[in-house]
Amino acid sequence: MFKDKINVQAIGTLKISDKETGTVLVDKRNAIHPGNMAYIMASALGGKPTSVNSSGSSPYINWMAFGNGGSSSTTTISYRSPRVFTTYDGLPITSSNSTLYSKTYQQEVVSTVYAPGEDMGGGNLVPENTSKVNFKVEMSHSEYEAMQQLSDPSITTPATDSSTDTTSVTAFTFDEIGLLAGVSTPTGMDETKTLMVTHVTFHPVLLSANRTIVVDYTITVQLS
């Protein structure tokens, strides 16, 4: 008996860790943008561009964006809701509500696709009817600093977590991340042709000079 209808489930997980010590700084699920994800998957299957990049190629996730608008703290920390919606509004991140609250940085990802039954390492096998995509970023101190200096040339990378330079500490602290289906250019990413696919908010993390931060963002696609 064949199935003419299947259920598709997409699950996103985020892990942020210190490369040198192996300390896990953040480990949680993230929110998928249903409207954008459905449209991007359909466009990719059909080999067609999205409406925000009508003269380009079919979309895929190739950028990770970081921001500092995902949480607030007074006596206790509170997290803002991920900006994901069930509809596709046809707008790029420059004019859509489907974007980070306060984007401060973006970096291209290194992606790895795992097939059903494939070993992801350590005997961790991908289940049947399932594939996983891992998007990895080892955050660049120099690129992050250069982007912050566009708005304030005095900003430098904080030496440690205990740095007293509050301006630099604020600039190098992030508490939200999104995966983007973007358009790469020789100078970076064209935001006017880019869509956000996922969004997650979490407690603030500081990118200091004595710490190398690695971000592993995994999307699991399962059919049943």
What are the residue ranges of the model-derived segments?
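Small cysteine-rich, disulfide-bonded extracellular modules of the LU/uPAR three-finger superfamily
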Residues: M1-F174, G182-S224
